Amino acid sequence: MTRHTPNRRARTWLGAGALLTTGALALTACGSGFNDTPGEGHASGGGTLRLLIGSSGDAETKAVTDAVAAWSEQSGVQAEVQTANDLPQQLSQGFAAGSPPDLFYLAPEALAGYAANGSIAAYGDDLANKDDFYPSLVDNFTVDGKFYCAPKDFSTLALIINTDLWSAAGLTDADVPTTWDQLASVAQKLTTDGRVGLAFGAEYQRIGAFMAEAGGGLVTDGKATADSSANVEALNYVKTHLNDGTFAFASDVGAGWGGEAFGTQKAAMVIEGNWITGAMSADYPGVKYQVAELPAGPGGKGTLQFTNCWGMAADSGNQDQARSLVEYLTSTDQQLAFSKAFGPMPSIQSAADAWSAANPDLTAFLSGAENAQFPPNMAGAADVITDFNAQLESLKTGDPQALLQTAQSNLEAITK
């Protein structure tokens, strides 16, 4: 996850965009990368280890910076952290200038492109803890049989319920929805003047959960399946309840994202990920809530899962030190510390029991991993999803089948 600010790109890609902040370590100047003179530099070697992260907010920045500082003191290797204000752009500029960071947050949808041009090192199989990562996360960062990079954490979507509003509507624990029909029913009971029953972002990264619950998805076994009947059913379900006023996009209730709609109580329920916990404690501490698994649809249970990895520059002269740092940052103790600080779930199986014990009210997020889909991660997928999101904004009045057929054509162009 993670405290997510009302920056849509940051919310959508779990840290791909970020606030520019200053941490405990010396942060390099922000701009086109790490080298002020484009073309002169190369990935550092034998000197300071450099990291570029896309942070969800101050809590994440401080946690990562402090962890890197602790490793630096322990290892004797200097390291510095830069927090990007536009991670994809700054990372691309760093590579173009010949001065990429040694380590950086890397989203799944960016992996294939960097792997294809040889920009990143495939170091996953060299990690001492490689067998501890969840297999589905390893798959997400594997290209052509090579495990490229260590998943740093992961998050899933769940149903977040305002418990005071729930009780006020006469609902009990027995009414927590487990089917689409039940979800529609409780959303109707929770909808009042000035408040919608259920809100979520007008984007695939939220609405895609309904597609998964219908038995659909954008890509199946490497083939584009956006225009499947299951996906049409999912979008029609969402459209129906957008029009009857019991569901709403966060933007339609004047909120920048689902967490804001929920925190300001413009929505009694939202579909969001782990990162909402940080926002609630920081910005809306008086709002009581519970987390439940998303209701099953015609295809059964389903949700979406998100992650980033620690990418490593192929030209880094500090690969041994960088790999050592990654092992430290993905260790059980450190991942549990990150989870406590800013909300994500550990990417390693050995931390699951401790995480569940420490977060008994959030276990629905972890349970969702059993039925979770990842957004497509092949080269070009990010652009396709951006276009799909633009069309989903008009779902309330649009033709679901037509929207999906456009997405199908775009996906076919990158999956052939």
Predicted regions located by residue number:
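Conserved C-terminal helix/tail region of periplasmic/extracytoplasmic solute-binding proteins
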Residues: T2-R3, S167, D173, E370-K416
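A structural signal for short loop-to-beta-strand junctions that line the ligand-binding cleft
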Residues: P101-D102, K130-W166, G197, G300-K301, ...
